[in-house]
Amino acid sequence: MSAIESVLQERRVFQPSAEVAAQATVSGMDAYKALVAEAERDYEGFWGRLARETLSWNKPFTKVLDESNAPFYKWYDDGELNASYNSIDRHVEAGNGERVAIIFEADDGTITNVTYNDLLQRVSRFANALKQRGIKKGDRVVIYMPMSVEGIVAMQACARIGATHSVVFGGFSSKSLNERLVDVGAVALVTSDEQMRGGKALPLKNIADEALAMGGCEAVKSVIVYQRTGGKIGWDDKRDLWMHEITASESDHCPPEWVGAEHPLFILYTSGSTGKPKGVQHSTGGYLLWAAQTMKWTFDWKPTDVFWCTADIGWVTGHSYITYGPLTLGGTQVVFEGVPTYPNAGRFWDMIQKHKVTVFYTAPTAIRSLIKAAEADPKVHPKSYDLSTLRIIGTVGEPINPEAWVWYYENVGGSRCPIVDTWWQTETGGHMITPLPGATPLVPGSCTLPLPGIMAAVVDETGQDVPNGQGGILVVKRPWPSMIRTIWGDPERYKKSYFPEELGGTLYLAGDGSVRDKETGYFTIMGRIDDVLNVSGHRLGTMEIESALVANPLVAEAAVVGRPDDTTGEAVCAFVVLKRARPEGEEAAKIAADLRNWVGKEIGPIAKPKDIRFGDNLPKTRSGKIMRRLLRSLAKGEEITQDVSTLENPAILDQLGESR
């Protein structure tokens, strides 16, 4: 692999304000460097101290890190705790039961405040209801829910009894849900009749019924349904149960099930480059520690904060920075059911103003779409709202381009709020490389420096460090507590995917390209080095999309690549060969529309290709390998400069280039 060229030449620097630095948990670069030095000096002592200070343990651990079966690392292995106890009970016991845990705003603007006392009651009742249905420690429960208090309650209730939850994003199709139900071996499914998004009721229970009817998930004995809209749904009296009915008669008291620190808290599926989604397994102790610790460091969390992460609980960001991180610290947070553009594109800014949000965390995709809306209509421009309560703003899901960064800084942050541009992954459990708001000088487009204890580096294809200024492969050199433990049911795939022998078998392979600044050492993320696309912060495997396209009766062959997109960061571009003659004009447009809808049904709307181009064939080597790098160039509209001498059919490039 030749060195990755860095094209970002960003020299603007934004210093933390004295006001922010003065009250920060990590105040100034000297404090940051002291923590980094502590971790380097005594790695296990550093991580042991954080775990003792941050979490409540029923049985204290005596050993911090077990590397005897690397890369299957164990942290705090002989310790026992419960994630739900840490998230709820301990705050009630400390006299903070009447503190608001969740300010929930529904799609239609209805607001519900949930205190820690309320949350304890609701989680305990639902946990007891799960136990009544025979669900026990170690069982897997799939949660297919809208953004709701009930979704958070379901996750916390599983944690309370030691069941392992697997949340599936409510935008996924019945086929995607079925794959996950089968792979994880679920014994129960928690869902909703419908979900509300942008004023529209969208089905969930009926999609869940389709998924269950596909077979392979006969172990699912209970389907528990939250009544959100009262819409018409199918019903199976032998299997289906209303959430409100089964919890009504349950006790408010449910003792937490103490579990070992390595007990699987959850399994969350993420797209892989080989087609089948990967069930990323996370622990209880190490994961919970980092979700809470990064709240303290990255967001400089204070008890007086009103925190708002706009992610969905179906993604890891919603796990770490809605369900677990804020609650573990006893914080108050906003949870939002709807979308940023309904009833208008000022919804986020209105909510920040109304709820007096102090820390705001969203995706670059949302920012880019709201920039367009604000430029078109001054009424929904952030400067038309009072955002003065904000003190820290953040981004997650994908790198943010410098232009959007500066707009966000000036118009949402009022040129005074630090931006924490966070790099991390489903597999890392929490933030890895990010500025600290009271310490790190900010550079637009750079996630800056690793958090203390995170040994990130940029290496070449043999695992050797590359010099600053030269692009390479992003890796992490030492294990950390919140890291992925395995791929559910496939430990060999875990080793090959994340600790490849080509890099020596000991480096965690992030799968992203990166470059470090020659002077500051700051990291800039340069995108995926494999065939996983990042669309609006959602990781989508190209193989999954290709498989969905080829499953259509019209399609003989398909290849999917990404291309840059101003709104979604990356757009899906599909090159398709039909089983009949290559269509043109209106016929091509109609078939393309049908294929988009097909992919939406097979996988979910987020996977729909933005571009579909038809060809008589695909560019292939003589051995039959599709030349994806050439397709990437075509998708971007670039001139083909690569060597095409190995191509069996070079003329196809002209045809695919013209078929836009």
Curated annotation (Swiss-Prot):
The keyword Acetylation applies. This is Acetyl-coenzyme A synthetase. One of its GO terms (cellular component) is cytosol. SUPFAM superfamilies: Acetyl-CoA synthetase-like (SSF56801). One of its GO terms (biological process) is acetyl-CoA biosynthetic process from acetate. ATP binds at residues 397-399, 421-426, 512, 528, 539. The keyword ATP-binding applies. CoA binds at residues 197-200, 317, 536. It catalyses: acetate + ATP + CoA = acetyl-CoA + AMP + diphosphate. PANTHER family: ACETYL-COENZYME A SYNTHETASE, ACETYL-COENZYME A SYNTHETASE 1. It comes from Paraburkholderia phymatum (strain DSM 17167 / CIP 108236 / LMG 21445 / STM815).
